[in-house]
Amino acid sequence: MGLSPNALSQYDTNSDPDCWWSATRCTSPKKSKLSHDIVTCPEPSTWGLTFDDGPNCSHNAFYDFLKEKKIRASLFYIGLNVKNWPLQAQRGLADGHDICVHTWSHHYMTTLSDEQVFAELYYTMRIIKDVVGVTPQCWRPPFGDVDNRVRAIADGLGLRTIIWSDDTNDWNIKPSGELPKSKIDRNYEDIINKGKDGSGVVVLSHEIRADTMNEFMEMYPKIQQAYKHVVPLT
């Protein structure tokens, strides 16, 4: 289920009452009881390393690379994937990565009822706890689609909302996607160049396919040169 164009066009973006990211990129709720979303790294020259959409059965070489380079990341796992590939999920924790929630089935969360939002988060937390042995404290909404209603439900489950400052768009690389590899390379290069002025960034990347994982492995030497720290977020 996608976002309704009518809902987006009719939303009051000036007052932005719901802090709806999909409409306004809002990450700082006006409601005092809700924490702001994590979007950037406050530490200078820091690459906040995050990967969405895992785990799956093709990750061994990628996880081997991260382990060899002593790289730790925040991994946003889909609940159904954890159910289908439990050994890969267990390795994520064993290798020292932070395990976070990316919902059960990767829907636009603001299109769901309260009960559906709760289920997407709760059952993902539960399968991670049952399979991996930890209770996640962080989550990322698929497509970044979150508003105050969804944030409040996540907050009630003890989950901090994490978005991103920079998007590699690696998920859209050809042949599965629409963008040539050269465009994804440029996206990475643009983020890498930010490190030269001491920026702290949270980068959206994916472990969804071999080509997205290969892209990070190829770019890592440049990332390491430009940023003093390449770290998970929690």
Predicted regions and their residues:
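Catalytic domains of cell-wall/extracellular-matrix polysaccharide-remodeling enzymes
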Residues: K83, H107-H229, T234
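Active-site beta->alpha N-cap acidic-glycine motif
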Residues: M1-Y108, Q116, E120, M125-Q137
